[in-house]
Curated annotation (Swiss-Prot), chains A, B:
The keyword Protein biosynthesis does not apply. NCBIfam families: PRK04424.1. The keyword Transcription regulation applies. This is Transcription factor FapR. GO terms for molecular function: DNA binding; DNA-binding transcription factor activity. Transcriptional factor involved in regulation of membrane lipid biosynthesis by repressing genes involved in fatty acid and phospholipid metabolism.
Amino acid sequence: MRKSKRERQRLLQETIRENPFVTDEELAEKFSVSVQTIRLDRLELSIPELRERIKHVARQSFADKVRALPLEEVIGDIIDIEPDASAISIFDVKEEHVFRRTRIARGHHLFAQANSLAVAVIHDELALTAKATIRFVRQVKAGERVVAKAKVTGKTKSGRTVVDVNSYVGQELVFSGTFEMYRSNMEKKDGDSNEYRD
Amino acid sequence: MRKSKRERQRLLQETIRENPFVTDEELAEKFSVSVQTIRLDRLELSIPELRERIKHVARQSFADKVRALPLEEVIGDIIDIEPDASAISIFDVKEEHVFRRTRIARGHHLFAQANSLAVAVIHDELALTAKATIRFVRQVKAGERVVAKAKVTGKTKSGRTVVDVNSYVGQELVFSGTFEMYRSNMEKKDGDSNEYRD
DNA sequence: TTACTTTTAGTACCTAGTCATAAAATCGGA
DNA sequence: TCCGATTTTATGACTAGGTACTAAAAGTAA
């Protein structure tokens, strides 16, 4: 059955959002209307043509790619970094990061921000978290901006680097953690458990 | 001065690699040759036309984005649960969960699996992680299946529930953590057959 | 000059559209 | 059921950024 205009336009938006590479012709076939109708729909919904959509997606990703490679894998945006000393990142808590019912941020996102910052601050080819002690000091809600501050504080006797990370919303401490990081270029060679290299 | 054919084609490749959004016309102007010459060059160098280049960039980034979205939600599948006692979940480590270079799983995914299992095992309206001590025992690689086992081990004097989570690949322990969970209804033991907190 | 490479020009055709106009089909209400 | 409005479809002219092909002009080396 052919849907109503409203319903078709709703589905059209959804379809294009899911697959921006779809042509008007394909959409026309999908909704059993003429190509002209699809074009009228796009006009009414202010959806740009295929090529413009593709260009937009490409431009975005190209801009992203220009960002430094190691920083790309960090959760949150690094705004300051002094290798092997300190680093700061910000992470905006959005709806997708919180429990639906309570709107409180899920712990692993705060952990991910802190952990990836601890990885980033270490100026080495390979950095992995060996151990961590973390404390969720207060709940973070959607809409809040979390500023994580990492500081390299020392080394364990086994040669691991210790990084302290404190995360704040405004002046308020919301998360704190101590990370023991394993790194590849340790001056002291220790018979650590099975490390994996490729 | 107009460069030799060889030199022009070398620069052409470089230019397009740096900016795939450049048209033949712009290139012709840049190298002071005709558009036809540029097209001949692309033909000889097997460089696709502008639209194909853009499409390629867009397709790549789109695939990445589709993979990145569920990354935020996937924290393992619960395969067994005994409320307020124990729970088991599995998590398949895929390419999107690992560091590209080393193919070692990023710590926050293992944490997320364990943490969300600790949340799930607590049979209450609200469960939040207050504190956690975790240990990454051995590195997990892409393709491996991580089985997390949570066990409620007791309570702190402040009334928090303590959950121990151990994660395995096969028989081998890869992650272990102790989670101190805050919960809303601490004394109440209602038979509320609630939904899973996502 | 001849022979060859390189460059330029021009044509027809393509896709996936744009914009504008007009006709046909469908729908809701009295 | 007819009327007017909305919605859909058709048509034509035009666009960018090409492909594919043919042909001629310009440059170069012997």
